[in-house]
Design a protein with these regions (language model features):
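Short proline/glycine- and polar residue-rich coil/turn motifs
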Residues: 55, 476-484, 493
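Structured, active/binding-site neighborhoods that engage oxygen-rich ligands
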Residues: 1-472, 496-499, 506-507, 514-532, ...
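Trp-centered recognition loops
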Residues: 440, 446, 478-487, 586-588, ...
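Secretory/extracellular carbohydrate-interaction modules
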Residues: 570-613
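Low-complexity, Ser/Thr/Pro/Gly-rich disordered linker/stalk regions
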Residues: 375, 379-382, 527-588
Length: 613
């Protein structure tokens, strides 16, 4: 089946819907229906505001397990072993990423240790290995979205991929749930009715399995009692509640409320995810899956921008072991899924998207409607950021920036390129970060500053050293209503880290004046060779809480790491690994000073590294 013209917009809407659902459900995860009703009455918007929403297992899994498609040796013989390798390659050892509740308690933890100790997939997640209770918990479906997103209108492919993926950690109904959700997402690209999606996805799981039974039972109840979703929840609670199934978070009760929400939500994105959230239980997982299905089905236009999208601002924090992949934007994930979808379909990427998907996936291109690529602002007055098709340097869209300011005042619009604990309210799933851009590299930005009536606008490219606070300024252009392709090489050899890249807008008038300064920006990206130093003696630990202490700019797979004077120290009882830098670097050189001590085992101290490509 040929990938349709609207696929790119729908894959973005689906991934965006997933992130919206996770954020909506996370603050009340594990709450019962009654507790939510007693505390909130009804929940029709985000219960909590965040500086930035921290990492979450429900987004970590889909974004990193799908990398098995790119990393595998033979796409034609793709199997659960490839997904198992992705799990081992990208998940830290017993911290971050997902819930490490203990062997025999957490399904994913159990499967991970099985793999680490030589039990291969799919045996690693099977009922035969771990028992039905462990194998049929909810994780089989919560990490599965990406396999549907790479299979638009192709549920057969979605089912095959989801079976391989879910089987790494789950078995039985845990796998059937993964297949069902992936097929619903795949079908949502083409189908015109949610009911048709729910019915057709049943074709891909056994008709007599418990998962199929609960789906059909909830649909039957809805047919007979279509008026009130709360009546349906009472039915689910009595017949498919948590007391009916073993384990900490069984898949069946949670599947039931997902079906309820999609039937009683009347094909409206907001109503559907809110109803799902008010049902309680594993809210971020359930609303996340429903958000993906409904996002694909409704498209960008069906997702309320001010209510759901604007608070997220396209930002996504993650917690895999590759630190430069932990501060991404939602367009990056959508573009990665799209690249894999075209590879699986054997189709050429459309010309409009070719450069983005093959060369500049992590750029700010603004081609997805409503996308901001997490551009932020800092200004004395009000600022407005809006995706638009009014202008574009390349493609069809750009980002319009407006600040209300006085003559001579500067307004900063920027991509934050490094994050730390101070940027978050909590430490959920223990994220850690490396910078996205480095000294020695070149920043590119296209800008069109607008003339204005009372004040002319100037635009100047800049970067900020997050350690020193220094603002490094580049070329400045005047507001003439024309596009200017600016570039700026960041001085090499610096210590610290680059925390912001962007544009400074300033209003210029003959005397004092107040008014708007505006500009369009497009195609913000970085290239060139890094040339920088890490001086550990100048660093302070990034302290999230007592059990989450990070060395700045590093990720850790396993081991004990800490700053010790001018050294980074890493020790272990068996093995330890840490990583820094960017995942796209190759052919580079690092110089460092080492001290080793192996009297009582392995110990390494690593000092003052400098690297360049």
């Amino acid at each position: 089946m040929k990938i349709t013209e609207n696929y790119m917009e729908k894959v973005y809407a689906g991934w965006l819907g997933k992130i919206v659902g996770i954020r909506l459900g996370a603050p009340i995860e594990g709450w019962t229906y009654q507790r939510i009703r007693d505390v909130f009455g009804e929940v029709w918007s985000y219960p909590v505001d965040y500086k930035n929403f921290a990492a979450d297992d429900d987004s970590n899994g889909p974004l990193f397990f799908i990398r098995a498609l790119e990393d595998c040796e033979d796409l034609n013989n793709f199997s659960s072993k490839d997904v198992a390798n992705a799990l081992l390659n990208y998940a830290p050892y017993e911290h971050g990423f997902f819930w490490w509740g203990g062997y025999g308690v957490s399904t994913e933890h159990t499967a991970y240790l099985n793999l680490r100790n030589g039990i291969p997939a799919p045996r690693s997640g099977s009922i035969e290995q771990n028992g039905a209770t462990m194998a049929e918990q909810i994780g089989g479906q919560i990490f599965i979205d990406s396999w549907g997103l790479v299979s638009p209108g192709n549920p057969e492919q979605a089912a095959k991929l989801a079976e391989q993926a879910a089987g790494v950690t789950h078995g039985g109904n845990g796998v059937y749930g993964g297949i069902y959700v992936a097929c619903c997402i795949s079908l949502a690209f083409e189908e015109k009715s949610i009911r048709d999606i729910l019915e057709k996805a049943l074709q891909y799981i056994p008709d007599d399995c418990e998962y199929a039974r609960v789906v059909k039972a909830v649909m039957k109840f809805h047919d007979e009692h279509p008026e009130n979703w709360r009546d349906c929840f009472d039915y689910i609670f009595e017949n498919f509640g948590y007391d009916k199934y073993p384990g900490t978070c069984h898949i069946i009760p949670n599947a039931a409320v997902m079906i309820l929400a999609m039937l009683y939500g009347h094909e409206d994105f907001s109503d559907t995810i809110n109803i799902c959230n008010m049902c309680g239980w594993d809210t971020d997982c359930n609303v996340g899956n429903v958000g993906t299905i409904m996002g694909v089905f409704a498209g960008i236009d069906g997702i309320d921008y001010d209510k759901w999208v604007k608070p997220i601002n396209d930002f996504l924090a993650c917690s895999n072991v590759v630190p430069s992949l932990n501060a991404v934007d939602i367009p990056f994930g959508a573009s990665y899924f799209a690249k894999m979808a075209y590879a699986l379909a054997g189709e050429e990427i459309p010309e409009k998207w070719n450069t983005i998907l093959n060369e500049r996936m992590d750029s700010c291109h603004f081609e997805y409607p409503t996308s901001t690529h997490a551009i932020r602002s800092c200004s004395p007055g009000d600022c407005h950021i809006r995706n638009t098709d009014e202008q574009a340097y390349t493609g069809e869209r750009s980002l319009k920036l407006t600040a209300v300011t006085a003559s001579g005042e500067e307004s900063f619009f920027y991509k934050q390129t490094y994050y730390s604990s101070e940027d978050f309210d909590d430490s959920r799933y223990d994220p850690f970060f490396a910078p996205l851009v480095y000294p020695g590299q070149t920043v590119h930005l296209s800008v069109m500053p607008l003339p204005g009536e009372e004040m002319a606008t100037t635009a100047q490219i800049y970067v900020k050293n997050g350690a020193t606070g220094e603002i490094i300024r580049g070329e400045k252009v005047k507001g003439d209503g024309e596009w200017h392709a600016l570039s700026m090489k960041i001085p090499g050899g610096q210590t610290g880290h680059i925390s912001e890249v962007g544009v400074i807008l300033c209003g210029v008038a003959k005397g004092f004046a107040m008014g708007d300064v505006s500009a369009y920006i497009d195609d913000l990206y970085f290239d060139g060779n890094p040339d920088y130093r890490l001086e550990f003696g100048r660093m302070q630990p990034d302290s999230w809480h007592v059990t989450h202490q990070e060395v700045p700019q590093f990720a850790k797979l396993k081991g004990h790491s800490y700053l010790d004077g001018q050294y980074l120290s890493l020790s272990c009882a068996d093995f330890a690994e840490m990583y820094t830098g960017h995942h796209l670097w190759n052919n580079y050189r690092v110089t460092a000073g080492f001290k080793t001590c192996n009297r009582y085992g392995a110990f390494c101290e690593y000092s003052s590294a400098g690297g360049h490509a």
